[in-house]
């Protein structure tokens, strides 16, 4: 019963991670954030692998899923520090998230709750991708939205890591017990002796 509840809980956590990652992937696509897009794609693949490992009793899949979650927590911690400019991180210094391919930063920058976007006239030779706008009236600035999204990812990843370790441990214990029982039976098994119903009688040679 405990194993079943652990498996069901882990599948539920993986489904929440999958939904959160897909939602995040959509907005990163809209904002041309190529580095998060690649990371989200890998995360979605590994989460699906974790679901398959849970349903099909594959402890190795869950171990790989747990290792990835540790990397996923580190990546999201970096995103939080990047957008909140913690330490030496600065979002205005290097366009890391889009590999410096455009001036886009985050979809939430111009589409956040309550944001009013006002176009600013730029140089006549400026490219369309480098348009200038002013954003005012936002109820929550986009760095905080991105940080909250990463915090949610970390929260789900921590729960997934704990349950993945627990379920994989249960799976490995069961595999060891099955191996032990199988080896014990193989040594203790003896083939039944076939009994013959023929009666042997002595032969007498005539004198």
UniProtKB/Swiss-Prot annotation:
GO terms for cellular component: plasma membrane. Its main location: membrane. It is found in: Cell membrane. The chain crosses the membrane at residues 2-22, 35-55, 62-82, 147-167. It is a multi-pass membrane protein. The keyword rRNA-binding does not apply. Glycans are attached at residue 100. The keyword Cell membrane applies. GO terms for biological process: regulation of sodium ion transport. InterPro entries: Na/K-Atpase_Interacting. Coiled coil: none annotated. It comes from the Eukaryota. Keywords: Cell membrane, Glycoprotein, Membrane, Transmembrane, Transmembrane helix. Interacts with atp1b1 C-terminus. Belongs to the NKAIN family. PANTHER family: SODIUM_POTASSIUM-TRANSPORTING ATPASE SUBUNIT BETA-1-INTERACTING PROTEIN 1, T-CELL LYMPHOMA BREAKPOINT-ASSOCIATED TARGET 1-RELATED. This is Sodium/potassium-transporting ATPase subunit beta-1-interacting protein 1.
């Amino acid at each position: 019963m405990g194993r079943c509840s652990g498996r069901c809980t882990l599948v539920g956590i993986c489904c929440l991670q999958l939904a959160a990652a897909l939602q995040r992937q959509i907005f990163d696509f809209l904002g041309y954030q190529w580095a998060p897009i690649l990371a989200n794609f890998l995360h979605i693949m590994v989460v699906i692998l974790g679901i398959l490992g849970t349903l099909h009793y594959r402890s190795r899949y869950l171990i790989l899923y747990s290792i990835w979650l540790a990397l996923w927590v580190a990546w999201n911690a970096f995103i939080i520090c990047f957008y909140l400019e913690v330490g030496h991180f600065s979002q205005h210094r290097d366009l890391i998230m889009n590999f410096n391919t455009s001036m886009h930063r985050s979809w939430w920058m111009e589409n956040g709750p309550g944001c009013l976007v006002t176009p600013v006239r730029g140089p006549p030779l400026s490219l369309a991708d480098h348009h200038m706008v002013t954003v005012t009236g936002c109820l929550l600035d986009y760095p905080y939205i991105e940080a909250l999204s990463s915090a949610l990812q970390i929260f789900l990843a921590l729960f997934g890591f704990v349950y993945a370790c627990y379920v994989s441990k249960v799976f490995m214990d069961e595999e060891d017990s099955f191996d032990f029982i199988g080896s014990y039976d193989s040594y203790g098994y003896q083939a039944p002796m076939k009994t013959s119903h023929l009666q042997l009688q002595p032969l007498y040679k005539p004198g």
